[in-house]
């Protein structure tokens, strides 16, 4: 069984949500100037219909500075800038709480490499997806880490085997709902999952998640 968050659909524009009109959700480097965590957050906010795609890709977007959207836009696009090398999820949660508390609430969880912690991530992921919420997910591999947006999972005989994600580092087909997959528990050891894109694959573990909900 495959479960994808409600509202995502394939149109001539690719994977979209409907917010006044069809809004393409996937953002790739070049659409915005910034780090993978911020890309993933903005895809999340588009999927939640908090922002339109044009609002996050057009850096000339004008918001009143005293509104919640104006404050958030200033935090990410003006005060910090998007090319500072990224944020920890805890920093992003703080910014969301500071600037966007009327619009959304967020929670951060961190995970060790233990079997129990990685299983806790899968439980958190299932709860989020079943509630039709994307989950910003940090994967760690040898020599680095990367932030992606989980939008669904595949369950086989009651066990989640795969997690479907939108990765801002890669292109996406116009006919696809996702462009990367985490295949769970593929090997023993620290990097127990396999992360697959159309270009490569890496052994990874999940180190952190950020869940955002509309109020």
Which residues fall in each region the model found?
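Active-site nucleophile-adjacent alpha helix/oxyanion-hole segment immediately C-terminal to the catalytic cysteine
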Residues: 1-78
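Active-site-adjacent substructure of cysteine-protease-like catalytic cores
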Residues: 111-165
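Alpha-helix termini
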Residues: 52, 101-105, 154-159
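Hydrophobic, Leu/Ile/Phe/Ala-enriched alpha-helical segments that form helix-helix packing faces
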Residues: 40, 44, 96-103, 128-129
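Noncatalytic regulatory segments and standalone regulatory/sensor domains
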Residues: 153-215
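Cysteine-dependent deubiquitinase/ubiquitin-like isopeptidase catalytic cores across multiple families
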Residues: 18-20, 78-124
């Amino acid at each position: 069984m495959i479960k994808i968050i409600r509202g995502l659909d394939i149109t001539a524009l690719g994977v979209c949500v409907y917010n006044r009109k069809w809004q393409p959700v996937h953002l790739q480097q070049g659409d915005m100037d910034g780090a993978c965590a911020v890309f993933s957050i903005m895809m999340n906010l588009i999927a939640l219909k908090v922002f339109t795609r044009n609002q996050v890709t057009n850096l000339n977007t004008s918001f009143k500075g005293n509104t919640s959207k104006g404050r958030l836009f200033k935090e990410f696009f003006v005060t910090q800038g998007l090319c500072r090398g990224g944020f920890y999820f805890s920093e992003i949660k703080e910014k969301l709480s500071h600037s966007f508390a009327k619009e959304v609430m967020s929670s951060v969880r961190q995970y060790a490499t233990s079997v129990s912690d990685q299983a806790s991530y899968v439980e958190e992921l299932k709860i989020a997806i079943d509630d039709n919420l994307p989950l910003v997910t940090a994967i760690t591999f040898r020599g680095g880490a990367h932030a992606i947006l989980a939008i669904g999972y595949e369950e086989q005989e009651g066990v989640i085997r795969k997690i479907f994600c939108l990765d801002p580092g890669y292109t996406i087909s116009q006919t696809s709902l996702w462009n990367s997959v985490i295949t769970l528990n593929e090997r023993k050891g620290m990097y127990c999952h396999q992360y697959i894109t159309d270009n490569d694959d890496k052994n990874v573990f999940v180190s952190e998640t950020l869940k955002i909900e509309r109020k």
